C-alpha cells in the first residue's frame, strides 16, 4: 500500500476581503459571472455552478472545477466576502483570485495558501 500521508494533493487558497461596497456583495448575477470567468480565464475546467441569493441579502456561489472548486460567500451587511480556491492540478489559485479581487475593488484583504 502506498503511503499518501505526505503526498501533495493540491493548493488551497483562502481569501477574506473587507470594506467592499454592499451593492457588489449582493449582486448575484455579477458574482457568478466573475467567479466563472476568473476560472475560465486561467484555464480551469468549469463543470458546474451553483448560486444562492439569501434573503434579505448575501450570496453564495460555488464553482465545481475539473481541478477542484471555487466557493464565494458574501456578507453585505458587514461589507466582507470570503472565498477559497482549491486546485489539484498545475494551475495557481492565486492567478484566479486576482480576477475575483479585481471585481471587489479593495486592497483590504488577507490571502493564505496551504499545501494539501
Give, region by region, the residue ranges found by the protein language model.
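Polybasic/polar functional segments that serve as interface/processing modules
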Residues: 1-116
Amino acid at each position: 500500500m502506498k503511503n499518501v500521508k505526505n503526498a501533495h494533493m493540491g493548493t488551497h487558497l483562502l481569501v477574506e476581503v473587507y470594506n467592499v461596497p454592499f451593492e457588489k456583495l449582493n449582486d448575484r448575477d455579477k458574482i457568478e459571472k466573475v467567479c466563472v470567468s476568473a476560472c475560465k480565464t486561467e484555464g480551469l475546467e468549469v463543470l458546474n455552478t451553483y448560486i444562492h441569493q439569501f434573503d434579505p441579502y448575501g450570496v453564495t456561489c460555488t464553482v465545481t472545477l475539473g481541478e477542484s472548486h471555487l466557493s464565494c460567500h458574501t456578507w453585505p451587511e458587514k461589507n466582507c466576502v470570503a472565498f477559497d480556491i482549491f486546485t489539484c492540478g498545475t494551475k495557481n489559485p492565486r492567478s484566479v483570485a486576482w480576477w475575483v479581487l479585481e471585481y471587489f475593488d479593495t486592497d483590504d484583504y488577507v490571502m493564505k495558501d496551504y499545501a494539501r
